Amino acid sequence: MKIIIDECVPHIVKKRLIEREIKTVQEMGWAGVKNGELLKFVEAEFDVFITSDKNLRYQQNLKDREIAILLLPSDQVPVIENLLPQIDEELENIKLGDFIEI
């Protein structure tokens, strides 16, 4: 499963979930790309998109997307650190088309 984290998500997710294949939007050269175009890029190369952008579901049509989206409640490192076990568990069970909000 190929995973990408949005530029608003702390890189601690990648650093702490080292057994997973995770890239960042910045590593892909997509920093600053608007969500609509970004989702097209992500769909072409990844299975899961992790973001903390709560407006994503209201600004974009997520129906029939061929990726899973995991929405985090915050972009604050202490919050994300506490959620790492839950994030890892959700990644174990996530399927294409899922939209999961932690």
Regions found by a protein language model. Give the residues of each.
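Acidic, metal-binding active-site segment of PIN/NYN-like and related structure-specific nucleases
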Residues: V42, F46-Q60
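N-terminal first-folded block
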Residues: M1-E45
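C-terminal structural segments of small proteins and small subunits
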Residues: A68-I102
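Short glycine-/acidic-enriched loop or helix-start segments at secondary-structure transitions
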Residues: K14-K15, Q59-N61, E81
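Structural motif
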Residues: K2, V48, A68-I69
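A short alpha/beta connector and helix-capping loop motif
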Residues: I22, Q60-S74
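Residue-level detector of flexible, active-site-proximal loop/helix-junction positions
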Residues: G29, L56, Q76
